UniProtKB/Swiss-Prot annotation:
Binding residue positions for Zn(2+) 2: 79, 117, 245
Organism: Homo sapiens
Role description: Has both folate hydrolase and N-acetylated-alpha-linked-acidic dipeptidase (NAALADase) activity.
Gene: FOLH1B
InterPro entries for this protein: Peptidase_M28 (IPR007484), Peptidase_M28B (IPR039373), TFR-like_dimer_dom (IPR007365), TFR-like_dimer_dom_sf (IPR036757)
Protein's UniProt name: Putative N-acetylated-alpha-linked acidic dipeptidase
Cofactor note: Binds 2 Zn(2+) ions per subunit. Required for NAALADase activity.
């Protein structure tokens, strides 16, 4: 093989060859290719989800879900067992509270999914089986896959409804990072991973796909989020982490290289567990619809700027984003008024409290289009969806974005720009309809 020499003598065998690690080959073999024959066996196998329930004391028909998968390709030292360990410890912590007489206000469901690596099968089948219940009762889903993919700083992907919850929670937790002793997790996170849009705040990314939150967020419209420790993406630009899904992804890898003291696991457990606790126990749901208004404006500006790369076509086909900007403006105003009412209403009135919480809970559902995205019926969230070109990454206003993508090479320009116009209408209608769900009840 070509490439560099092995890093250690233990990698060398007894043959009279170089034992280089690649890539490619040397000498007479440099132009040759290796042909592999792969023989796979397809069979139907039973899978098992494990669901634990901690019944709520006041609103047992409102569900907060903490879920992660336990199946792995090989040993799964990081993916998924670093996440499964956090779920187990979180369950144990809540169990200790229950033994002391405590119960959450709302019901907490703890889920261990099977067959995630085979296409998110466990979580998807369970959510489909229980879709009617979840649509009526699901408050939030917190994903608990791998707790670490590095040991540099926190990484959070979530709905904008959870931004304030995450900010407030991380301000109360101690940072595990070296050089930040005595400082909060929020401070180290902001310093190491600043938001590119909001000065003085940490980066929170959009939810994409490739994990068990997909069916809850993208299909059912249940507010979702996830947190883990990550690497420095500025210096480590490769995707994933070394040894991902390999036979070398073991407990020893975590213990010796990633988290010898398990302090990052503890921090992730505190973030995930803290989010579940607040979502299940707060009298008023810790969702802030104003944060949604802010990002909607940002996303509308972004997609408009993309479309303006084609000014002549915009004019020719009478394309306008006025309806979308108007809907975003209305959403912003109504969200602001709703937040004012949220501060002043009588929280001792159980009917009024339930009504306000329901408006918050169902806001994410309001962004769901039952028809789904064009050619992607299982993705129904109008504001967020996995990128058509990278399933793991999230895209905003995906219907418009996909319609605009590579539009100059479309065979029928009139039809292509008609599709863009149609998706603008869908987005504008959805944002306006979502705004109306926050209006004061007559």
């Amino acid at each position: 093989m070509g490439g560099s020499a092995p890093p250690d003598s233990s990698w060398r065998g007894s043959l009279k060859v170089s034992y280089n690690v690649g890539p490619g080959f040397t000498g007479n073999f440099s132009t040759q290719k290796v042909k592999m024959h792969i023989h796979s066996t397809n069979e139907v196998t039973r899978i098992y989800n494990v669901i634990g329930t901690l019944r709520g004391a006041v609103e047992p028909d409102r569900y907060v879900i903490l879920g992660g998968h336990r199946d792995s390709w090989v040993f799964g030292g990081i993916d998924p067992q670093s996440g499964a360990a956090v779920v187990h410890e979180t369950v144990r912590s809540f169990g200790t509270l229950k033994k002391e007489g405590w119960r959450p206000r709302r019901t907490i469901l703890f889920a261990s999914w099977d067959a995630e690596e085979f296409g998110l099968l466990g979580s998807t089948e369970w959510a489909e089986d229980n879709s009617r219940l979840l649509q009526e009762r699901g408050v939030a889903y917190i994903n608990a896959d791998s707790s670490i993919e590095g040991n540099y700083t926190l990484r959070v992907d979530c709905t904008p409804l959870m931004y304030s919850l995450v900010y407030n929670l991380t301000k109360e937790l101690k940072s595990p990072d070296e050089g930040f002793e005595g400082k909060s997790l929020y401070e180290s996170w902001t310093k190491k991973s600043p938001s590119p849009e909001f000065s003085g705040m940490p980066r929170i990314s959009k939810l994409g796909s490739g994990n068990d939150f997909e069916v809850f967020f993208q299909r059912l419209g249940i507010a979702s989020g996830r947190a883990r420790y990550t690497k420095n993406w500025e210096t480590n630009k490769f995707s994933g982490y070394p040894l991902y899904h390999s036979v070398y992804e073991t407990y020893e890898l975590v213990e010796k290289f990633y988290d010898p003291m398990f302090k990052y696991h503890l921090t992730v457990a505190q973030v995930r567990g803290g989010m579940v606790f607040e979502l299940a126990n707060s009298i008023v749901l810790p969702f802030d619809c104003r944060d949604y208004a802010v990002v909607l404006r940002k996303y509308a500006d972004k997609i408009y700027n993309i479309s303006m790369k084609h000014p002549q076509e915009m004019k020719t086909y009478s394309l306008s984003f006025d309806s979308l900007f108007s809907a975003v403006k209305n959403f912003t105003e109504i969200a602001s008024k709703f937040s004012e009412r949220l501060q002043d209403f009588d929280k001792s009135n159980p009917i009024l409290l339930r009504m306000m919480n329901d408006q918050l809970m169902f806001l994410e559902r309001a962004f769901i289009d039952p028809l789904g995205l064009p050619d992607r019926p299982f993705y129904r969230h109008v504001i967020y969806a996995p990128s058509s070109h990278n399933k793991y990454a999230g895209e905003s206003f995906p219907g418009i974005y996909d319609a605009l993508f590579d539009i100059e090479s479309k065979v029928d320009p009139s039809k292509a720009w008609g599709d863009v116009k149609r998706q603008i209408s869908v987005a504008a209608f959805t944002v306006q309809a979502a705004a109306e769900t926050l209006s004061e009840v007559a």
